[in-house]
Regions:
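C-terminal signal-anchor/stop-transfer transmembrane helix together with its immediate cytosolic
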Residues: 207-247
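…and closely analogous acidic/polar surface helices at protein-protein or active-site interfaces
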Residues: 2-37, 53-58
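VWA/integrin I-like adhesion module and closely mimicked acidic/polar interface patches used
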Residues: 73-76, 98, 105-176, 180
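Sec-exported extracytoplasmic/periplasmic mature domains
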Residues: 26-34, 44, 64, 68, ...
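Juxtamembrane amphipathic/hinge helix adjacent to a transmembrane helix
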Residues: 184, 188-220
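Soluble periplasmic/extracytoplasmic beta-strand elements of cell-envelope proteins
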Residues: 20, 36-42, 60-62, 98-102, ...
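Extracytoplasmic/secreted cell-surface and envelope-processing proteins
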Residues: 3-5, 48-50, 108-112, 138-142, ...
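Short, charged loop segments at secondary-structure junctions
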Residues: 4-9, 45-78, 177-180
Length: 247
């Protein structure tokens, strides 16, 4: 499936792409009550935000603290974060093991190994990789980031410095990754579309769970076969620590 809508700037919508994505992912996490979910952000190297866990409160708190500038890396390496996610999922036994890769960038500089190499490995391990390209346009407004102040640059009056920059998304490679792992590629142009994408993935990857009536929440940790395992990968967050993109 492919979905595409406009994510053009609006003076009435000051939220950044990161704000929008975090809100939608928060809703998705709440729906997957009995699944262990992990969260990984990445630039050149992956950044583990949260290991696989059933503790949704812990996961949500780690999601909330995500911000641009957690790493001083610049560039993107999709293969490295796929390897991280696959390695965490490979040894686990579950009816459902999926990665959800969300990005608004492309590999830069060119990687030593194509992400498709890792996609083929995921397919052999029966791991599905759903891919989501964020943004309908390659041109987007950006905040300039000051690495010394660890904050966005501002004019003397406190107004953020905003520029327009070009950031193409490699949709072809994202589509190929999804196809090779029997998953789907999506394009999200606005918040409602992104929400519908996660809703669709939620429906596609429902796992049958049988629990005794008196089962306690803590007991779920002892029953990995009854749960799905999901790793959410957010590439655009740390992709360029110098630039924070907004819709």
């Amino acid at each position: 499936s492919m979905l595409a809508l406009d994510m053009s700037p609006s003076p009435n919508n000051p939220n950044t792409r990161l704000d929008v994505v975090k809100e939608v992912i928060k809703e998705f996490i709440n729906k997957r009550k009995y699944d262990r979910i992990g969260l990984v952000a990445f630039a050149v190297d992956p950044y583990l935000v949260s290991a696989l866990t059933l503790d949704k409160e812990y996961l949500q708190s780690n999601l909330a603290r995500l911000k641009v500038g957690l790493t001083e890396q610049t560039g993107t390496n999709i293969g490295s974060v796929l390897a991280e996610g696959i390695n965490r999922l490979r040894p686990l036994e579950s009816k459902s093991k999926i990665l959800i890769l969300l990005t608004d960038g492309k590999d830069e500089p060119p990687p030593k190994h194509s992400p498709l190499v890792y996609a083929e490995g995921a397919q052999k391990d029966k791991i599905k990789i759903y891919t989501i390209a964020i943004g309908a346009s390659t041109r987007t407004r950006t905040y300039l980031y000051d690495p010394n102040a660890r904050d966005i640059m501002r004019y003397a009056n406190g107004t953020p410095v905003v520029e327009v920059a070009e950031y193409p998304v490699d949709k072809e490679i994202l589509q190929e990754i999804a196809q090779r792992t029997d998953a789907n590629f999506f394009e999200a142009g606005d918040k409602s579309t992104l929400r519908s994408i996660y809703d669709e993935i939620d429906q596609l990857e429902k796992t049958d769970i049988e629990l005794e009536v008196n089962a306690l929440y803590e007991d779920l940790y002892q029953w990995p076969l009854a749960c799905g395992f999901i790793i959410l990968i957010l590439g655009f967050i740390l992709e360029h620590s110098i630039l924070l993109r907004i819709p």
